[in-house]
């Protein structure tokens, strides 16, 4: 058994190789990588094989929650890192998570934005705003930044609850909000969770208004599926990602009106139409 399992999902995004390369350069070596691959492209499977990844090939339209479940059930590590193929790691990410934060049952990981242009800068400010305003060190709440690094037993219990609470058809249709569902199902106490002091993951942001609109339009459509859930979860509440207002967040909130407006309009169009 490895100490850390990286549970990766990919649809064949161009940044997949960057993520795999970042994993191969880790200063900590006792890990395994399991990747659920829903790409049509056979070159993605070859790439995963080249990097020694345990591939779980699935149908191209496999949704995110099912992909996360398959990655988890095919991994063996004592700790689990939920990763996407748009999020490369810093070279010391695994080492830092294990030796500095492993006493916690779940860890939220600060990120930094990758890319160029106006929309990337907007996303970076918004990310900093989320990390600043929605996580409180005294453990009162986590509303927007969600854990990616879990102890194995926490994820076991979370997926067990989700499989028991969601019928199989709906489980396979959930393509958005899976991180929030997993977090809610884990039923953690505030003292179980922390957020890293460092930015240990990077994120390739959408660089065009068209890409942002397409993504959040899809999120809006996917929200309809979440409304079918029979148990109480923040993920099926439209205000679950609302950032609290305070004096210290006023300026960044004003500066990010363009991206927040674009995301909101796209989401609502997808949700209602």
Regions found by a protein language model. Give the residues of each.
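Glycine-rich, basic loop-to-helix element that forms the pyrophosphate-binding segment
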Residues: 59-75
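Short aromatic/hydrophobic "clamp" motif used to bind/position activated sugar donors
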Residues: 80
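Short, flexible, basic/aromatic active-site loop/helix in glycosyltransferases
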Residues: 109-111, 115-141, 145-147
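Non-catalytic, C-terminal membrane-associated alpha-helical segments of glycosyltransferases
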Residues: 210, 214-273
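Short, well-formed alpha-helical segments that are part of the catalytic scaffolds
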Residues: 12-25
């Amino acid at each position: 058994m490895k100490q850390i399992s990286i549970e990766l999902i990919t649809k064949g995004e161009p940044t997949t190789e960057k993520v795999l390369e970042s994993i191969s350069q880790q200063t900590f070596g006792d890990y395994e990588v399991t990747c659920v691959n829903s790409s049509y492209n056979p070159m993605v499977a070859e790439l995963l094989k080249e990097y020694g990844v345990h591939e779980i090939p699935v149908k191209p339209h496999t949704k995110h929650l099912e992909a996360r479940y398959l990655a988890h059930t095919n991994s063996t590590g004592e700790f689990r890192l939920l990763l996407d193929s748009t999020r490369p790691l810093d070279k010391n990410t695994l080492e830092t998570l294990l030796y500095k934060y492993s006493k916690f049952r779940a860890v939220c990981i600060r990120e930094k934005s990758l890319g160029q242009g106006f929309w990337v800068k907007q996303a970076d400010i918004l990310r900093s705003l989320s990390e600043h305003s929605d996580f409180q060190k005294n453990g009162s709440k986590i509303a927007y930044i969600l854990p990616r690094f879990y102890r194995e037993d926490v994820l076991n219990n979370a997926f067990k609850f989700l499989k028991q609470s969601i019928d199989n058809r709906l489980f396979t249709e959930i393509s958005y909000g899976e991180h929030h569902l997993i977090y809610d199902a884990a039923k953690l106490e505030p003292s179980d969770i922390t957020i890293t002091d460092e930015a240990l993951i990077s994120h390739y942001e959408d660089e065009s208004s068209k890409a942002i609109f397409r993504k959040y339009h899809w999120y809006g459509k996917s929200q309809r599926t979440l409304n079918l859930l029979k148990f109480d979860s923040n993920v099926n509440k439209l205000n679950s990602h609302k950032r609290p207002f305070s004096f210290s967040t006023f300026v960044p909130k004003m500066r990010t009106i363009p991206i927040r407006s674009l995301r909101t309009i796209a989401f609502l169009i997808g949700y209602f139409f």
